[in-house]
Amino acid sequence: MLSIKVDERKPFDISLRNFKRACEKAGIKQELRDRQHYVKPTEKRKIAKRQAVKRARISQRRAFI
């Protein structure tokens, strides 16, 4: 569970920004996006393979330049 200490002397905006940053670090937003719908394991592997190929192409381009 994510918790943020709110200091009454500081503005609310700063506490909200700290909360958003903590959520980003914890990966809550990404996890919610991933859990919106079920993805079969075979589909996960296909996506992972596609991403690996894409990363390899990008790294080849960078190495060539």
From Swiss-Prot:
Some GO term, biological process aspect, for this entry: which one? translation
Pfam families assigned to the protein according to its UniProt record, in alphabetical order:
Ribosomal_S21 (PF01165)
A GO MF annotation of the entry reads: structural constituent of ribosome
What InterPro entries would the database entry show? Ribosomal_bS21, Ribosomal_bS21_sf
Cite the Gene3D superfamilies for this sequence. Ribosomal protein S8
- Keyword annotations of the record: Ribonucleoprotein, Ribosomal protein
User: Looking at the UniProt record for this protein, which Gene Ontology cellular component terms does it annotate, in alphabetical order?
Assistant: ribonucleoprotein complex; ribosome
Family the UniProt entry places it in = Belongs to the bacterial ribosomal protein bS21 family.
- Name of protein: Small ribosomal subunit protein bS21A
